[in-house]
Amino acid sequence: AYTLPPLDYAYTALEPHIDAQTMEIHHTKHHQTYINNVNAALEGTSFANEPVEALLQKLDSLPENLRGPVRNNGGGHANHSLFWKVLTPNGGGEPKGALADAIKSDIGGLDTFKEAFTKAALTRFGSGWAWLSVTPEKKLVVESTGNQDSPLSTGNTPILGLDVWEHAYYLKYQNRRPEYIGAFFNVVNWDEVSRRYQEALA
């Protein structure tokens, strides 16, 4: 069964950009609920011991009765597990090395990336995510998904994600999603994103 991954920092650590109350509720309540639900759906099946990312990659071949729960709750678990890791206190700044080079060659540079990523997060109607992903051709792409859909299900590997469900920002930012997106760039853990980029290339 899946379990809630501990955070590498305190709930207060991302203040003032992401508030402690949001972090605690988001982690212990929302993420935990996705885990409880996907565990319940997979209990007693041969899929219960597989990494959730592997199930999302082969979503279309899963038994029909499991597709919905894995897509929604398994997606919620995988997406949030990535989200916590790509955040860090004293984050932000700029990516370095191979990732910086790829952002330049594939997307047009950091400013262009931030613009595209902000647009993806802003124009996602309703709930969903903005992503920086690696395609099967090993190219970087900015994309967005609805609800808890994962880029893994369409063959891409997400390396940076931003949750734009209202539960991720409403307590502090209410309807000011643009402000939340701007604040996110101050807590991005580019070292972790770079690590995930290298992993996706392997």
Swiss-Prot record:
Pfam families assigned: Sod_Fe_C (PF02777), Sod_Fe_N (PF00081)
Catalysis: reaction(s): 2 superoxide + 2 H(+) = H2O2 + O2
The protein's required cofactors: Mn(2+); Fe(3+)
GO molecular function list: metal ion binding; superoxide dismutase activity
Residues engaged in binding Mn(2+): 26, 80, 163, 167
Cofactor remark from the record: Binds 1 Mn(2+) or Fe(3+) ion per subunit.
Protein species of origin: Methylomonas sp. (strain J)
Organism superkingdom: Bacteria
Assembly and oligomerization: Homodimer.
Family: Belongs to the iron/manganese superoxide dismutase family.
Disulfide bonds: none
The protein's name in its UniProt record: Superoxide dismutase [Mn/Fe]
GO cellular component: cytoplasm
E.C. number: 1.15.1.1
Function in brief: Destroys superoxide anion radicals which are normally produced within the cells and which are toxic to biological systems. Catalyzes the dismutation of superoxide anion radicals into O2 and H2O2 by successive reduction and oxidation of the transition metal ion at the active site.
Gene3D superfamilies recorded: Fe,Mn superoxide dismutase (SOD) domain, Iron/manganese superoxide dismutase, C-terminal domain
